[in-house]
């Protein structure tokens, strides 16, 4: 079985002291880059898609593509709903075969966040689907969800335990100073807060907004309990900038099979670096 749940992946990472990267993909080419690189490095990876990606590609198409590529490369892959907010949307995708979900109700007050997440957990666990939820909010924009930096807030360690116990989630996304998008300056991550959260919560912890973080910061968060690292913007930026450069230098280019190669190569460099930073090479 090559398409797997994230639950076992993250539990293995927690025991092994490494993290599994979740790469946001958008089309066939970005999927190829992630899977080919992961297979060559024998690394566990999660294929993540926002609601916009699932709409763009089509849920059934995306599921079929992940399954086909996992079999082609004899490499286990997990497909994950990233930053999904609507119960009916999640339910439809779970019934289509998705086995890993992030329900993002972090914009709601604490009690309502618990209620919304528990509803999703109760449904998903009937299908053996793992559920991630977020406590605290990251600044920046992910798909159509935007949070002003002034409105972002950090995860409360004591509330984190209550949240985990009340909802029954399988992994917890924490807010410790990262943001969606690229950073204008290096973020000041609250490592002491992360260490405190780890003392209160024994679940695999998830770090969103990792695009542009230094190797040192990523590896320090892993030492303090992060088991899943989300990367999106850095992939898009590398892919699109390389494509722009190529078409500027080769205005006569018309064959996507040719001009997309430079974009894929640039994105591949990012994927391989993140895998190395996460310490998961050879862990698949």
From Swiss-Prot:
Zn(2+) binds at residues 83, 180, 208. Transmembrane segments: none annotated. Belongs to the class II fructose-bisphosphate aldolase family. TagBP aldolase GatY subfamily. Signal peptide: none annotated. This is D-tagatose-1,6-bisphosphate aldolase subunit GatY. The lineage of its organism: Bacteria, Pseudomonadati, Pseudomonadota, Gammaproteobacteria, Enterobacterales. Its EC number is 4.1.2.40. Forms a complex with GatZ. GO terms for biological process: D-tagatose 6-phosphate catabolic process; galactitol catabolic process. Pfam families: F_bP_aldolase. Pathway: Carbohydrate metabolism; D-tagatose 6-phosphate degradation; D-glyceraldehyde 3-phosphate and glycerone phosphate from D-tagatose 6-phosphate: step 2/2. Binds 1 zinc ion per subunit. GO terms for molecular function: tagatose-bisphosphate aldolase activity; zinc ion binding. SUPFAM superfamilies: Aldolase (SSF51569).
């Amino acid at each position: 079985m090559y398409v797997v749940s994230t639950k076992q992946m993250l539990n293995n990472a927690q025991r092994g002291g490494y993290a599994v990267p979740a790469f946001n993909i958008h089309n066939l080419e970005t999927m190829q880059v992630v899977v080919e690189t992961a297979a060559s490095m024998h690394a566990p990876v999660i294929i993540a898609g926002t609601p916009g990606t699932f709409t763009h590609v089509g849920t059934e198409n995306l599921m079929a593509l992940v399954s086909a590529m996992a079999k082609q490369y004899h490499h286990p892959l997990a497909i994950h709903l990233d930053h999904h907010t609507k119960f009916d949307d999640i339910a439809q995708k779970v019934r289509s075969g998705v086995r890993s979900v992030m329900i993002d109700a972090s914009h709601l007050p604490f009690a309502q966040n618990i209620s919304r997440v528990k509803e999703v957990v109760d449904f998903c666990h009937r299908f053996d689907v793992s559920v991630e939820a977020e406590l605290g909010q990251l600044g920046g924009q992910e798909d159509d969800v935007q949070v002003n930096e002034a409105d972002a807030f950090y995860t409360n360690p004591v509330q984190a335990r209550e949240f985990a116990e009340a909802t029954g989630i399988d992994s917890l996304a924490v807010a410790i100073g990262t943001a969606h998008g690229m950073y204008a300056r290096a973020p000041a991550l609250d490592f002491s807060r992360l260490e405190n959260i780890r003392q209160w919560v024994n679940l695999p912890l998830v770090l969103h907004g990792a695009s542009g973080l230094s190797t040192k910061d990523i590896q320090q968060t892993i030492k303090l309990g992060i088991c899943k690292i989300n990367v999106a913007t850095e992939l898009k930026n590398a892919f699109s900038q390389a494509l722009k450069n190529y078409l500027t230098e080769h205005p006569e280019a018309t064959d996507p099979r040719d001009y997309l190669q430079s974009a894929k190569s640039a994105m591949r460099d990012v994927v391989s670096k993140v895998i190395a930073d996460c310490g998961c090479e050879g862990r698949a």
